[in-house]
Regions:
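A glycine-rich beta-strand to alpha-helix segment
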Residues: 30, 39, 43, 119-144
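N-terminal glycine-/serine-/threonine-rich phosphate-binding loop
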Residues: 1-32
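Glycine-rich N-terminal segment of FAD-binding domains in flavoprotein oxidoreductases
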Residues: 26-52
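Class I SAM-dependent methyltransferase SAM-binding "motif I" and its flanking Rossmann-like core
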Residues: 136, 140-185
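Ligand-binding beta-strand-loop-alpha-helix segment within the catalytic cores
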Residues: 56-130, 246, 251-260
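ATP/nucleoside-binding phosphotransfer catalytic cores, i.e., glycine-rich phosphate-binding loops
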Residues: 186, 190-261
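Short beta-strand segments
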Residues: 33-37, 65, 102-103, 130-133, ...
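A glycine- and small-aliphatic-rich helix-loop capping segment at beta-alpha/alpha-beta transitions
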Residues: 46-57, 82, 144-154, 213
Length: 261
């Protein structure tokens, strides 16, 4: 696992956007897994800026979803399908045909989960998966005590996650669904490159447990320790509880440029 400490969220977004752009230059039809929430917005803004400036041609890139609420009506503005189309697909100039995600409105949710895992495999696998992290260490919607071998499935949200997400529903927790479809930890680990971005002091403890704590289902993000190519990008506030912060700064400062992220 590589840990990169950046000054702020904007710097983290630019760094990751350039890594995504470099991937698309090497592999124009790369399958990019995206996350929702406020944390990755600087990434999407920076990547869209590169597309507009002609620095990368993303016209053949493909986008896939990490998770989806269960039970929101089709077209609900806070369904993750709608969010990804609005914040990622459209700004990159891509069509909806380039996008794939689980069906949270399906009658048979179990079948929809299995179908999404198959679709990801049939698409050749995810080349780069973006991740955020919850204050309790969850990734996707794999809450604490999720199986580290889990596949795409339905999960019940913790009350803390519902509280955290109420800001997207007019601060009304009653509007936040109780269930989601999420890629499992095992599904996430299938991606070729995992990139986790965390910003703010509120994420510092979760970051420290992920990077320096034991591998544990209590901290789902700690599964990144098992991945052959995992990158954790954090701002100074989110890095504030890392015991090895100085070491991480030193190794990144002396990293050969040709290695990339």
């Amino acid at each position: 696992m590589e840990v990169v400490i950046v000054p702020d969220a904007k710097a983290g977004g630019e760094l990751i956007a350039e890594a995504m752009a470099a991937l698309v230059r090497r592999k124009p039809d790369a399958l990019l897994g995206v996350a929702t929430g406020s944390t990755p917005l600087p990434i999407y803004e920076a990547l869209a800026g590169k597309v507009r400036a002609g620095l990368v041609d993303a016209s053949k890139a493909r986008i896939c979803q990490l998770d989806e609420y269960v039970g929101l009506p089709t077209g609900h503005p806070e369904s993750y399908r709608a969010v990804v189309l609005r914040e990622v697909v459209e700004p990159l100039g891509l069509s909806e045909a380039s996008f794939m995600g689980p069906d949270g409105s399906a009658e048979d949710i179990v079948a929809a989960c299995e179908a999404y895992d198959r679709a990801l495999a049939e698409a050749g696998g995810v080349d780069l998966q973006l991740l955020g992290i919850g204050t309790d260490g969850h990734i996707g919607f794999n809450e604490p005590c999720s199986s580290l071998a889990s596949r795409t499935r339905i999960k019940t949200l913790t009350e803390q996650t519902r509280v955290d997400n109420a800001r997207f529903f007019d601060d009304d927790i009653d509007q936040v669904p109780h269930h989601v479809i999420t890629q499992g930890i095992g599904t996430i680990l299938d991606a070729r490159h995992l990139v986790l971005l965390a910003t703010g002091e509120g994420k510092a403890e979760a970051v420290a447990q992920t990077v320096e704590g034991p591998l544990s289902a209590l901290v789902p993000a700690s599964a990144l320790q098992l991945h052959r190519h995992a990158t954790v990008v954090v701002d100074e506030a989110a890095a504030s509880k890392l015991k090895l912060a100085d070491y991480f700064r030193h190794t990144y400062a002396n990293k050969p440029a040709w290695q990339g992220l």
